[in-house]
C-alpha cells in the first residue's frame, strides 16, 4: 500500500509540474503572438536547412520573406511565391513558369506556411516549455516544444521553437519529420513596420515576360 501511495504521489506531482510548464509555455507564446500581431509588416531574411538523418546529408538554402497580415512574398533560390491571401502565384524561374492556385482556408488557419510561420503555435498544438539558454552575446533564448494535437494529419511529430526572450521574437523553428528528415528555419535578420505597398502581393506579368502561366484553380 505504501509503495502504491508513493507511486500515486509521484504521478500527481509530475502532472502538477507538467501543468505549470505548459502554463509557462502558453504565457511565452501568447507574448510572441501579441508582439508579432502588433507589427504592420515584417521583412525577414532566413535560411532553411534540411537534415536527412537516414543518409546523414544536409543542404541549406537562403530566402527572403515579406509579410503583411495574411499576405506574403517568399523568395527562395529560383522560386518566388506571392499571395494576396486569396490567390497564390508560384513563379518557377528555372522553368519560366507561373502556377496560380487558390489559398485554402484550412492551410491559412492550421498549416505551416509563410503567412503564419511566426504564429503557427496558436492552433492545433500542445506546448511544453523546455528551458532558457543564455547566449554569448547576453541574449536569453527560450526553448519551447510543440506537439500536433492531430499528429496523424501532420508529416512531423514535433516542432522546436527558439525565442528571443527580450525581443519576444522567434529566431528559429526546427520541424522534426516522421520520415527522419528535419527542417530548420533560422531567422538571419528581422525588420518590422516598414512601408510595404500592396503591389508586392500581386503578380505582375510584366516582370516575367515569356513565362507560361498555368491556372490550377
Residue map of PLM features:
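Extracytoplasmic
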Residues: 39-43, 60-62, 69, 83, ...
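Soluble periplasmic/extracytoplasmic beta-strand elements of cell-envelope proteins
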Residues: 43-47, 73, 89, 143-145, ...
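A generic structural motif
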Residues: 47-53, 75, 91, 147-149, ...
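Gly/Pro-enriched, hydrophobic low-complexity segments
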Residues: 125-209, 216
Amino acid at each position: 500500500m505504501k509503495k502504491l501511495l508513493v507511486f500515486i504521489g509521484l504521478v500527481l506531482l509530475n502532472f502538477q509540474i507538467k501543468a505549470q510548464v505548459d502554463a509557462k509555455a502558453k504565457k511565452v507564446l501568447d507574448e510572441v503572438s501579441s508582439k508579432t500581431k502588433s507589427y504592420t509588416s515584417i521583412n525577414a531574411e532566413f535560411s532553411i536547412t534540411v537534415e536527412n538523418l537516414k543518409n546523414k546529408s544536409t543542404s541549406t538554402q537562403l530566402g527572403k520573406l515579406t509579410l503583411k497580415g495574411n499576405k506574403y512574398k517568399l523568395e527562395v533560390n529560383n522560386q518566388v511565391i506571392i499571395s494576396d491571401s486569396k490567390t497564390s502565384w508560384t513563379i518557377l524561374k528555372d522553368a519560366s513558369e507561373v502556377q496560380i492556385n487558390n489559398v485554402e482556408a484550412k492551410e491559412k488557419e492550421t498549416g505551416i506556411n509563410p503567412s503564419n510561420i511566426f504564429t503557427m503555435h496558436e492552433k492545433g498544438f500542445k506546448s511544453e516549455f523546455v528551458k532558457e539558454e543564455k547566449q554569448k552575446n547576453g541574449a536569453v533564448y527560450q526553448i519551447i516544444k510543440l506537439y500536433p494535437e492531430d499528429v496523424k494529419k501532420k508529416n512531423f511529430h514535433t516542432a522546436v521553437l527558439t525565442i528571443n526572450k527580450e525581443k519576444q521574437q522567434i529566431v528559429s523553428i526546427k520541424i522534426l519529420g516522421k520520415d527522419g528528415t528535419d527542417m530548420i528555419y533560422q531567422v538571419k535578420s528581422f525588420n518590422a513596420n516598414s512601408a510595404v505597398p500592396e503591389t508586392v502581393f500581386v503578380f505582375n506579368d510584366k516582370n516575367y515576360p515569356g513565362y507560361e502561366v498555368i491556372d490550377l484553380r
